[in-house]
């Protein structure tokens, strides 16, 4: 599967001036697809709109080679179209441990959980836990290459499996 499924303008800021390792990112996801599945029934993405807030905190160990990174993701999903995600709230904590072998590379491992709560009796409720590992490499001052493997180890109202992701990230 590949393609564009949503457009998401985002804003990231540091809400507490003297706490540089805590930040918040807010985004508004606008779906640009009409159907959540392809002709073979494979899930592509939700067609719900989403307001998302992500809270980040990191701690670098004294050696400077290791970093503990935590994230709390919250999502409110809504819209007029039929979507499994409409009228749901997601609470998703994650913890990542990164190792920096040099100034351009990162190797990481993680555990994440996602809890989707239906906000009415027609809404979809779901949860899952994933573990995984990956890496990042800084190609230029602006462009990073990222790879990630995730194994979904448990869940309710979801299929278990794994995912392989590769991406380019531009940081301006």
Predicted regions and their residues:
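Flexible, surface-exposed loop regions and adjacent strand-edge segments
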Residues: 40-45, 86-89, 125-128, 163-167
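Repeated loop/turn-to-beta-strand initiation elements of outer-membrane beta-barrel proteins
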Residues: 19-22, 63-68, 103-109, 139-147
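Outer-membrane beta-barrel translocator/channel fold
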Residues: 110-123, 146-165
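Transmembrane beta-barrel strands of outer-membrane/channel proteins
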Residues: 24-30, 70-76, 95, 109-113, ...
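Outer-membrane pore/translocation modules
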Residues: 1-88
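Residue-level signature of outer-membrane beta-barrel architecture
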Residues: 13-15, 57-61, 97-99, 137, ...
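Membrane-embedded beta-strands of outer-membrane beta-barrel proteins
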Residues: 9-11, 26, 53-55, 93-95, ...
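Outer-membrane beta-barrel "beta-signal"
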Residues: 8, 137-138, 160-172
């Amino acid at each position: 599967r590949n393609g564009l499924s949503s457009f998401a303008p985002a804003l990231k800021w540091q809400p507490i001036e003297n706490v540089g390792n805590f930040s918040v990112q807010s985004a508004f996801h606008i779906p640009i697809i009409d159907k959540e599945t392809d002709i073979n029934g494979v899930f592509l993405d939700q067609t719900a709109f989403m307001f998302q807030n992500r809270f980040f905190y990191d701690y670098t160990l004294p050696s400077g080679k290791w970093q503990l990174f935590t994230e709390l993701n919250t999502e409110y999903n809504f819209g007029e179209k039929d979507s499994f995600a409409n009228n749901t709230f997601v609470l998703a904590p994650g913890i990542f441990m990164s190792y920096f072998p040099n100034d351009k590379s990162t190797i990481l491992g993680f555990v994440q959980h996602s809890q989707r709560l239906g906000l009415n009796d027609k809404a979809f409720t779901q949860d899952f836990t994933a573990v995984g590992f990956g890496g990042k490499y800084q190609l230029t001052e602006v462009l990073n290459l990222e790879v990630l493997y995730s194994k979904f180890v448990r869940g309710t109202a979801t299929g278990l499996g794994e995912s392989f992701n590769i991406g380019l990230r531009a940081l301006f």
